[in-house]
Amino acid sequence: MFQKKAIVIDGKGHLLGRLASVVAKSLLSGQKIVVVRCEELNISGPLSRNKLKWADFLNLTMNTNHARGHRHGRSPSKIFWRAVRGMLPHKTPRGQAALDNMKVFEGVPAPYDKVKRVVVPSALRVVKLNTTRKYTVLSRLSQEVGWKYRAVVAKLEVQRKQRSSTYYRKAALVKAYRTQALKKFSA
């Protein structure tokens, strides 16, 4: 289903590849999508196996000059962005336009912390992955391969959750006072 406004997807608990395929399909239909909390995405398989696969990927270089070519994004948002790019015809104008309609973030930045976030049931780990199977959290893998900002993002997330809880406590109080006042004046 197509909406004019951007859909904000909370990446926590989703499997990376499954979410990337759903996002790519939606992008090709013209939908704008924002994925937040990419550091909480999951990859099936134990950390050791995923680290070995990433080590193979990081060894890709150019034959003539190793300093040029093959830039490997290590942040969770770049890893997810690249996974989606691999599912789009990104060398065509249509694919490039689709890729321009996507934004990815670690954590939940300011404009999107007040917006309703959705999940994709067909990509949730608890739905699609057997409970006995091991999985890797993307922030841990990123940290192991060179991402330096895991602690910073975690600290900012704690601050955001505190702000959010105080906001909702105040909103609940206002709602309670309003219902009290309505009861008082209606009687």
From Swiss-Prot:
State the superkingdom.
Eukaryota
Q: Which Pfam families match?
A: Ribosomal_L13 (PF00572)
InterPro entries found in the cross-reference section: Ribosomal_uL13 (IPR005822), Ribosomal_uL13_CS (IPR023563), Ribosomal_uL13_euk/arc (IPR005755), Ribosomal_uL13_sf (IPR036899)
MF (Gene Ontology): mRNA binding; structural constituent of ribosome
Q: Which GO terms describe its biological process?
A: negative regulation of translation; translation
Q: Which PROSITE patterns match?
A: RIBOSOMAL_L13 (PS00783)
Q: Alphabetically list the UniProt keywords.
A: Ribonucleoprotein, Ribosomal protein
List the record's Gene Ontology CC terms alphabetically: cytosolic large ribosomal subunit; ribosome
Q: Which CDD domains match?
A: Ribosomal_L13
Family indicated by similarity: Belongs to the universal ribosomal protein uL13 family.
- Supply the name of the protein: Large ribosomal subunit protein uL13
- What gene is this protein a product of? rpl13a
